[in-house]
């Protein structure tokens, strides 16, 4: 086989493999599961960017959305307006809408980059910088963004791998609310 044909064959094979990898990547990510759903949420605690102490255990009685992100992650940047919109609707100002506390945990970022990111993109919720220890490990975070919806009793109701969409978060919250209501009525 002449060298030009061999090179073309190698390039073609490499491209075919890349297409297969990227074509199936999203499907694999969507099927990722976690042992945490239904379990008590692992610890999320630390000093936030604004210097206050935040601990998920202090949020018992409230819904919490724990979001793992990075300021350099494109899907994290793309999901951020969705998180902002969700947080604004669920800020507790409307008694007809369930309150959900959002907390973000930065993944491998500097505090200055995180502050700049939130300054540019909005979001008034607590943010734990990357130096908070083993939080991502305890939650089993594989890649950012990942988000977890936690019930008022402190149990993980759902995991979202990849960027969130507000409507999907609303659906997860509604299913969680229905499950909690079912638990209360014994059904």
Feature locations, PLM:
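N-terminal targeting signals for export/organelle localization
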Residues: 1-43, 185-187
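Short loop/turn microsegments at loop-to-beta-strand junctions
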Residues: 41-42, 64, 144-145
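Hydrophobic beta-strand core positions in alpha/beta domains
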Residues: 65-67, 104, 149
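Structural microenvironment flanking redox-active thiols in thiol-disulfide oxidoreductases
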Residues: 77-121, 131-138
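Thiol/disulfide oxidoreductase modules built on the thioredoxin-like
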Residues: 116-124, 130-187
């Amino acid at each position: 086989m002449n060298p030009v044909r061999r090179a073309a064959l190698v390039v073609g094979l490499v491209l075919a493999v890349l297409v297969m990898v990227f074509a199936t990547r999203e499907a694999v990510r969507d099927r990722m599961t976690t042992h945490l759903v239904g379990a008590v949420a692992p610890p999320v605690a630390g000093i936030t960017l604004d210097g206050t102490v935040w601990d998920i255990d202090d949020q018992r009685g409230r819904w919490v959305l724990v979001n793992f992100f990075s300021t350099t992650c494109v899907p994290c940047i793309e999901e951020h307006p969705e998180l902002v919109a969700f947080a604004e609707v669920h800020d507790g100002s409307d008694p007809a809408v369930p309150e959900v506390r959002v907390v973000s945990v930065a993944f491998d970022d500097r505090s200055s980059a995180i502050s700049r990111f939130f300054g540019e993109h909005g979001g008034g919720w607590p943010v734990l910088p990357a130096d908070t220890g083993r939080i991502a490990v305890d939650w089993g975070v594989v890649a950012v963004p990942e988000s977890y919806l936690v019930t008022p009793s402190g149990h993980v109701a759902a995991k979202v791998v990849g960027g969130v969409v507000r409507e999907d978060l609303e659906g997860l919250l509604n299913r969680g609310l229905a499950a909690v209501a079912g638990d209360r009525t014994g059904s």
